[in-house]
């Protein structure tokens, strides 16, 4: 059989692939056992003749001895150690082999295996037979018993090493070096400790020990006995004082218990009083809180108007809203026509309510017909225009006419309110002036018509229209005592019929904000 080889810087050592794969127990790297490493090293460096290195056959006179053994040979270990020292035995009945012409001219290559076989001891001196199985470039036959013996020897060697070193075997060379260095260091430490102990023992042995004489010993004994009597007397005195202190301690504990009882009774009565006081305070605070809430509610009711609660006008981004209905459309936000119609219905109902309150003093050429989400506007010629959609965005003249008429009605009501303020001698700065100027069909320059108009401009015009309507609503609330017909509760008598709320709000409060609240 062919043998594997491990490359080395100076030589190669044959490896038997049939051997099991050993693993280093420290670094867990795989190991390959190559015969006996020490034997292989000595073999390549001119090994001396000995029993452990007996694989060289017949010295220089043999074929194996006359030829340099390099990568061409694998020497398997013997099953049993040789029984005698000296030259390895030869086969019985065979003389010293001499190199012939055919063998000496051939280089011995990677096809030779030296296998030791066990033979019974002969009468002449117990020599063993050595069988050489040689095959030029052919298959080699392994010795099964020799292989098993090799495994047993290695296993036994590892067990012995493990028992003696208390370290798991086998180990690779690097781990063996590390372990060796560690053990050497421990040995050095132990050696230093031993030397220190020996020095200490020698020092103690060299010291002189003073031995007291009989007289000195008796004198020292009397002195110690005297000290002992004094200590006993002190202990008795201390025990007496301890008894007195314990008696006083019991009296103090009795007094302390009585004091604790009195203190517990006092705190119990104090806690009961505090509990009653807290209960009365909580009842008082609850009544005061109810009074405060009732007063705030009354004040809120005094300032509340049904129109402000019924028609809240706010801003929602780019849209003006009334009762949370958006009025207008944007390219990015497609508001449904149902929501726009509902917003117009609320706006028409609010303006119609305020206009009817001042009739017949307030006469407007435009009449509003609030009909839910389908309001209509009637002009001076009794022509009716629908103020609801959907309508054609590019041709909606009737819808545009209805919005223009609504804007005209709102402007007429604002002019009427301004004239009422002037009649009541209100300063011009506090008179009703719409924040966004209305001119025909435009609010602050933005047209309220939808035909041929951008949705952004139309939405802004509607937003400003609702803001003007909110200003008119606040003026109406501040200058009237308006209540629905079904109302049974009237405002307090201390509020006058005209101008009271409007005057109390001051100049800033008369200008409502259109911001979202």
Curated annotation (Swiss-Prot):
The UniProt record lists the keyword Ubl conjugation: yes
Pfam families documented for this protein: APG6, APG6_N
Domain of life assignment: Eukaryota
Family matches, as InterPro entries: Atg6/Beclin (IPR007243), Atg6/Beclin_C_sf (IPR038274), Atg6/beclin_CC (IPR041691), Atg6_BARA (IPR040455)
GO biological process entries: autophagosome assembly; defense response to fungus; pollen germination; protein targeting to vacuole
Coiled-coil positions: 172-266
Segments of skewed composition (Polar residues): 95-105
Entry keyword set: Coiled coil, Cytoplasm, Cytoskeleton, Ubl conjugation
Disruption phenotype: Male sterility due to pollen germination defect.
Changes after translation: Ubiquitinated. The interaction with SINAT1 or SINAT2, and the presence of TRAF1A/MUSE14 and TRAF1B/MUSE13, mediates its proteasome-dependent degradation.
Chain intervals for the UniProt region annotation (Disordered): 76-106
Tissue: Highly expressed in mature pollen grains. Expressed in roots, leaves, stems, flowers and siliques.
Gene Ontology CC, one term: phosphatidylinositol 3-kinase complex
Places the protein is found: Cytoplasm; Cytoplasm, Cytoskeleton
Biotechnology: Can be used to induced male sterility when expressed in anther tapetum. Development of male sterile lines is important for commercial hybrid seed production.
Main location group: cytoplasm
Keyword field contains Coiled coil: yes
Induction pattern: Induced by infection with the bacterial pathogen Pseudomonas syringae pv tomato strain DC3000. Induced by infection with the fungal necrotrophic pathogen Botrytis cinerea.
Additional notes on this entry: Plants silencing ATG6 exhibit impaired autophagic activity and accelerated senescence.
Biological function: Required for normal plant development. Required for pollen germination. Required for autophagic activity. Required to limit the pathogen-associated cell death response. May be involved in vacuolar protein sorting. Binds to microtubules. May facilitate efficient recruitment of other ATG proteins to assemble scaffolds for autophagosome biogenesis.
Family designation: Belongs to the beclin family.
The protein's assembly and partners: Component of a phosphatidylinositol 3-kinase (PI3K) complex composed of ATG6, SH3P2 and FREE1. Interacts with SINAT1, SINAT2, SINAT5, SINAT6, TRAF1A and TRAF1B. Interacts with TUBB8/TUB8. Component of a complex made of VPS38/USL1 and PI3K main subunits such as VPS15, ATG6/VPS30 and VPS34. Binds directly to VPS38/USL1.
UniProt-recorded name of the protein: Beclin-1-like protein
Species: Arabidopsis thaliana
């Amino acid at each position: 059989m062919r043998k594997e080889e491990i490359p080395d810087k100076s030589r190669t050592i044959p490896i038997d692939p049939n051997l099991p794969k050993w693993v280093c127990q420290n670094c867990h790297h795989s190991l390959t056992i190559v015969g006996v490493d020490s034997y292989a090293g000595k073999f390549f460096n001119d090994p001396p003749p000995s029993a452990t290195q007996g694989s060289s056959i017949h010295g220089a006179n043999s074929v194996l001895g006359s030829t340099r053994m390099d990568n061409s040979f694998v020497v398997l270990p013997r099953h049993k150690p040789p029984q005698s020292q000296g030259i390895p035995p030869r086969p019985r009945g065979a003389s010293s082999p001499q190199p012939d012409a055919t063998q000496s001219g051939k280089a011995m290559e990677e096809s030779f295996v030296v296998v030791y076989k066990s033979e019974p001891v002969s009468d002449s001196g117990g020599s063993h037979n050595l069988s050489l199985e040689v095959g030029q470039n052919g298959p080699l036959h392994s010795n099964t018993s020799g292989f098993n013996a090799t495994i047993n020897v290695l296993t036994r060697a590892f067990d012995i090493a493990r028992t003696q070193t208390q370290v798991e075997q086998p180990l690779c060379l690097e781990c063996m070096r590390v372990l060796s260095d560690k053990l050497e260091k421990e040995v050095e430490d132990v050696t230093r400790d031993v030397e220190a102990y020996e020095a200490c023992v020698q020092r103690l042995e060299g010291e002189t020990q003073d031995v007291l004489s009989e007289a000195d010993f008796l004198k020292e004994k009397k002195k110690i006995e005297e000290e002992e009597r004094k200590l006993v007397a002190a202990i008795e005195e201390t025990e007496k004082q301890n008894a007195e202190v314990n008696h006083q301690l019991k009296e103090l504990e009795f007094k302390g218990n009585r004091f604790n009882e009195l203190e517990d009774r006092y705190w119990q009565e104090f806690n009961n009083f505090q509990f009653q006081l807290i209960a009365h305070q909580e009842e008082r605070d609850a009544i005061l809180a109810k009074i405060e809430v009732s007063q705030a509610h009354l004040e809120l009711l005094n300032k509340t108007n049904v129109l402000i609660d019924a028609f809240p006008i706010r801003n929602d981004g780019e849209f003006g809203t009334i009762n949370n209905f958006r009025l207008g459309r944007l390219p990015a936000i497609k508001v449904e026509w149902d929501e726009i119609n509902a917003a117009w219905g609320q706006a028409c109902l609010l303006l119609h309510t305020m206009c009817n309150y001042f009739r017949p003093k307030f006469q407007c050429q435009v009449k509003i017909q609030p009909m839910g989400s389908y309001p209509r506007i009637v002009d001076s010629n009794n022509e009716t225009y629908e103020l609801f959609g959907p309508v054609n965005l590019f041709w909606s003249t009737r819808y545009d006419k209805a919005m223009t008429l609504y804007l005209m009605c709102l402007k007429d009501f604002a002019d009427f309110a301004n004239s009422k303020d002037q009649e009541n001698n209100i300063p011009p700065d506090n008179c009703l002036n719409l924040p966004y100027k209305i001119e025909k069909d435009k609010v602050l320059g933005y047209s309220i018509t939808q035909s041929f108009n951008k949705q952004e401009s139309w939405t802004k015009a509607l937003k400003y229209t609702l803001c003007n309507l909110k200003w008119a609503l606040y003026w109406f609330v501040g200058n009237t005592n308006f209540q629905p017909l079904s109302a049974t509760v009237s405002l307090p008598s201390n509020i006058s019929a005209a101008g009271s709320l409007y005057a109390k709000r001051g100049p800033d409060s008369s200008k409502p904000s259109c911001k979202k609240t």
